[in-house]
Amino acid sequence: MLFLMDVGIGAGSGLVLSVPALLWLEKERQKKGEKKPWHTAGVCLFAFLLAGIVTVTGIPALYRLRFDANVNLIPMAELFSNFSQYLKNMILFVPFGFFVPLLWKRERMVEKTVSIGFLFSLFIELMQLFSMRATDIDDLLMNTWGTWVGYLLFRGVLRIMPGICERFGAGENPGLDGFFCEGDKPSGKEAAVRAESPVCRLEMELCFGIVLLLMLTLQPLIAEALWELLYR
């Protein structure tokens, strides 16, 4: 119960802090001629997911960083003795692998989605060098595997609900692998608008940056204050 409360407070406060910046991104998108409320709702849910992952993995606030390396570089050494933990690490990143290609059309190649999941997991593991937690290659492998499973889930849902891409997706799909969803191919004025919009090109990176910056600075202070109120 305390674990669920901790995740709820961490992810919820991270989302609340991120909402103003995410709404600003939507406003900038509307200025360029794209109005996508479902996409904005999806980005907010993705921000909640990022904040939840940061909370669960115990990334420390910047003002609490203290180098205390505990590193495991031997892959799958405890696969059978600690299988449930391997499974949890994989499941943690399944929603991540689903939402990235759903929300951003230019990330709809499996290589891009899995690479993003790998880099995010690598960031987490490197930060855990400063959090008195273990930096484990198994976590990196299972998180990346979970991202791939999430991508497969996205492709499966796409077969059942082909219109979901256009409803939640934004930006332009270059179609480098020949994979286009319904409505992915812009033309005429719409293509020109998208090509000129830096928000379309950088929205995912901005979302990551905003959420991670807030989770490493302001959010821990707010979470501490909320816990103090609960236990008064």
Regions found by a protein language model. Give the residues of each.
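Loop-to-transmembrane alpha-helix initiation sites
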Residues: 135-141
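A ubiquitous, low-specificity "background" feature that marks scattered single residues
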Residues: 131-134, 145
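Bulky hydrophobic segments
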Residues: 1-126, 130-132, 152-232
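Residue-level detector of alpha-helical recognition elements and their boundaries
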Residues: 69, 141-142
